[in-house]
Structure formats: structure tokens, C-alpha cells
From Swiss-Prot:
Cleaved signal peptide residues: none
Cofactor entry: Co(2+); Zn(2+); Mn(2+); Fe(2+)
Source taxon at top rank: Eukaryota
Listed InterPro entries: Creatinase/aminopeptidase-like, Met_Aminopeptidase_Type2, Pept_M24, Pept_M24_MAP, Pept_M24A_MAP2, Pept_M24A_MAP2_BS, WH-like_DNA-bd_sf, WH_DNA-bd_sf
Name of the protein this chain belongs to: Methionine aminopeptidase 2-2
Disordered, as annotated region: 1-102
Entry function: Cotranslationally removes the N-terminal methionine from nascent proteins. The N-terminal methionine is often cleaved when the second residue in the primary sequence is small and uncharged (Met-Ala-, Cys, Gly, Pro, Ser, Thr, or Val).
Organism: Colletotrichum graminicola (strain M1.001 / M2 / FGSC 10212)
Reaction(s) catalysed by this chain's protein: Release of N-terminal amino acids, preferentially methionine, from peptides and arylamides
Species classification: Eukaryota, Fungi, Dikarya, Ascomycota, Pezizomycotina
Length: 440
């Protein structure tokens, strides 16, 4: 989920200038696991001692009930609980990369290994969330087709995530334990981020659309944030390739003690080495300079650190223990986004809140606290919980500074934008690209 850079911050960081010369094993897919521990049935007959009349009586067969086998493959659509596919919670690792230069020692350092071993719950939750993201998105990539409504697509992805986490999110507090880390974004063409359909939306995916699919999965508040772009016409291939390569370059550059401004420089250099021809016109691919990657904190999608996607003078260092969403956006337009269209994404702020006078706002805040906490949500999620006539209260929460609204972020109309994103864990011993898969 994209983090937007305030306009005044761009000036302070001196970003957006020309790029300079400053300069993987995939996880197991997890769609099948061996379960050969089922006992074989023992059937038999015992002959009783002869009765008084001399005839032997047979006892009834004592059949043992067959143990129900654990599922070994994901269903289509995905509905098999992830913990059923991995009953020992031995979820696939992400792509592990050794640190470079002065941090290379971390790979074999005993103290760092000990610290890594203390993170068992942290890693288990993250790897489960990542495997759920992989399985749901791979299903989505095979099944999303032009002609579907955006609501169908979003609900298909969200239903899959909820089923695999085992948290449908209907009972009070259930969505807070696991499920969607933030709403499924389906931003089309010039719209780069933060668009998901509200109730009643009839928008249909078309053959000529470029769609960013950005969704999060959380397990116990540990959020995997990963995104990809889909297009159905080959003329957009270079746009998608530029952004995918730029994201991979940013992921490769990231690491402990690396300055985020340098990561942005690497991303921009790769991104802007591409151009794309659309309908006979050639466009340079531009990094969208006021969108950022970001740290992820428990229960909070946007942490305190940002990762620019253009070179900047931001000297903030990445540190051991940080979780980063490295995401990049490329555009054939201005390379700058503005708020546009109807708001769908919201999140409660973590800091202290003002007193509320409106009863509807108080009631809605209680629902948000119990079901989402500081996790982002959308209007459709309130609809699922049976809330109605809540817009007045929701707008009051926004105007009071208690809830933040995230409007769609769009470049100029007629342009096309693309996005790819991975979540990385800066573990004490290695960098783990937790969301890496065979697809991207």
C-alpha cells in the first residue's frame, strides 16, 4: 500500500532530478505437503469360546475409523486453511540474500544467529502470511479476465485471504486476528494507488486496462504487503518490465546500514532506462516521485521510515529488525500523482484522539476499534459487518483527525501507471524477501 510524499518534503529532499551513477532461491510454492502419517485400518474377527450348545459365536467386526487425511493441495478458488496444508507450521522461507561488505559477517556470526532464533513467532507469522499472499495472488493471476467487475475481483481475492487465514472477519474482533492487512487495491490506468470499489460500483475491467493489484495479508498483526500489475495487451509489456526490474533493483540494494536515498537512486536509474510505445507513440517511463516505499510495523501498514523511488539526499539508514515494503511505480505521464476520485481506504490513527460529540461517530469508532484497530479498512468492510448509514459518522471521524482517509492517487488522465512491490525482513543474519514467489 503506497505511502505518499508530502509536496513540501520533495523540495527538502531535492528529489526528482536525473539519475546518477551512484551506485535467489524461490520459496516452495506450498500448494502441496506430504501427510503420510495416517494409520492403516486394522480389521479382524475374534472367535469367542464355544457356548453351552457347542457352537462358536462370532464377535462383530471391530473396525477402526479411518483418520481424515489432511489436505495436500490448495483448492480452486483457494479455500483450504493454510495451517491445514502446513500442520507443523513449517511455512516456506522467502528468498534469503546475504548482506554485503561490512555486514557479510552476519551470515555466520553466532550472536546474530542466536538473535535470529529468538524470532520464531515473528518469522512463523510472516511466512504464513506470505504463503497465503502467494497462493491467493497466483490464483488471481490465472483467473482475472477482462469483463469482470472490479467488485468481483476484489471480493475474490479478499475471500481467499480470509479463508486461508481462517478468519472470515464477520464476528467481532475476528478481522483483527488475521486476514486482510489492508483492502485489495485495484487501480486502473492513470490511477496508481488506493482505489478499491465501494458498494454499488459497476466498473468493469477492460482489455486495454493496466491494473495494479495491491493487497496485504496479516497474521497476528504482521503484515505482508505485495503488489503486481496486470495488462492484457503486449504494448504495455515494457512498462511492466521497467517497474518490475526497478523493484528488484531496490530489493537487491536494500540492507542493514544502507541509506534510503541511495536505494531511491538505484530504483530511478533502472526505471528510467526504459521507454514504452503505446498506440504508436513512444513514452519515457518515469518514476512517480511523490510515492514511496515504507517500513511496516505490527498492526500498522505505514511505519516511520520511507523509501523514495527517485534519488534523494535522505540519509536515513535501514536497520536490523526493520520490515520494509519496497514498492516502485512507473508512469507514462508526469511522474507525479494527485488525490482524485471517491475515497474508499481509511485507517484509524494511532495517536490520541479528540472528544467526539456525534453519536454515530462514537458508535462507528467502537466498531473500528474492535474489528480493525489501526489496520486499514474500506467501506465494503463496514458493509460486511452490517453497518449502514455510517458516512456521516465516518466523515466526522476523518474531520476530527481520528481516522485518516486515503484518496486514490492518480497521474494525468490518459497516462498509464504500473506497480510492483515486495516485503523484506532485515533479519540479524540475512535479508529475507518474504513475499518472493515464482511469479515475481
Amino acid at each position: 500500500m503506497a505511502a505518499q510524499v508530502p509536496t513540501e518534503a520533495l523540495k527538502e529532499l531535492n528529489v526528482g532530478g536525473p539519475a546518477t551513477n551512484d551506485k535467489a532461491a524461490n520459496p516452495t510454492e506450498g500448494n502441496g505437503v506430504d501427510h503420510d502419517s495416517d494409520d492403516s485400518d486394522e480389521e479382524g474377527e475374534e472367535v469367542a469360546a464355544p457356548a453351552a450348545g457347542g457352537a462358536a459365536k462370532k464377535k462383530k467386526k471391530n473396525k477402526k475409523k479411518k483418520k481424515k487425511k489432511s489436505p495436500t493441495a490448495q483448492s480452486d478458488p483457494p479455500r483450504v486453511l493454510m495451517s491445514s496444508l502446513f500442520p507443523n507450521k513449517n511455512y516456506p522461507k522467502g528468498q534469503e540474500e546475504e548482506y554485503r561488505d561490512e555486514n557479510l559477517y552476519r551470515t555466520t556470526n553466532e550472536e546474530k544467529r542466536h538473535l535470529d532464533n529468538l524470532n520464531n513467532d515473528f518469522l512463523t507469522d510472516y511466512r504464513e502470511a506470505a504463503e497465503i499472499h502467494r497462493q491467493v495472488r497466483q490464483w488471481a493471476q490465472k483467473n482475472i479476465k477482462p469483463g469482470q467487475t472490479l467488485t468481483e475481483i476484489a471480493e475474490g481475492i479478499e475471500d481467499g485471504v480470509r479463508a486461508l487465514t481462517g478468519h472470515p472477519g464477520i464476528e467481532e474482533g475476528d478481522a483483527y486476528k488475521g486476514g486482510m492487512g489492508f483492502p485489495c487495491g485495484l487501480s486502473l490506468n492513470h490511477c496508481a494507488a488506493h482505489y478499491t470499489p465501494n458498494a454499488g460500483n459497476k466498473m468493469v475491467l477492460s482489455q486495454g486496462d493496466v491494473m495494479k493489484v495491491d493487497f496485504g495479508v496479516h497474521v497476528n498483526g504482521r503484515i505482508v504487503d505485495s503488489a503486481f500489475t496486470m495488462a492484457f495487451e503486449p504494448q504495455y509489456d515494457n512498462l511492466l518490465a521497467a517497474v518490475k526490474d526497478a523493484t528488484n533493483a531496490g530489493v537487491k540494494e536494500a540492507g542493514i546500514d544502507v541509506r534510503v536515498g541511495d536505494v531511491g537512486g538505484v530504483i530511478q536509474e533502472v526505471m528510467e532506462s526504459y521507454e514504452v510505445e503505446i498506440d504508436g507513440t513512444t513514452y519515457p517511463v518515469k518514476s512517480i516521485r511523490n510515492l514511496n516505499g515504507h517500513t511496516i510495523e505490527r498492526w500498522s501498514i505505514h511505519g516511520t521510515k520511507s523509501v523514495p523511488i527517485v534519488k534523494s539526499n535522505d540519509t536515513t539508514k535501514m536497520e536490523e529488525g526493520d520490515v520494509f515494503a519496497v514498492e516502485t511505480f512507473g508512469s507514462t505521464g508526469n511522474g507525479f500523482v494527485r488525490e482524485d476520485m471517491e475515497v474508499s481506504h481509511y485507517a484509524k490513527r494511532g495517536e490520541g484522539h479528540a472528544a467526539l460529540r456525534l453519536d454515530s461517530a462514537k458508535r462507528l469508532l467502537n466498531v473500528i476499534n474492535k474489528n480493525f484497530g489501526t489496520l486499514p479498512f474500506c467501506r465494503r468492510y463496514l458493509d460486511r459487518l452490517g453497518q449502514d448509514k455510517y458516512l456521516l459518522g465516518l466523515n466526522n471521524l476523518v474531520s476530527s483527525g481520528i481516522v485518516e482517509a486515503y484518496p486514490p492517487l492518480c497521474d494525468k488522465k490518459g497516462s498509464y501507471t504500473a506497480q510492483f512491490e515486495h516485503t523484506i525482513l532485515l533479519r540479524p543474519t540475512v535479508k529475507e524477501v518474504i513475499s518472493r514467489g515464482d511469479d515475481y
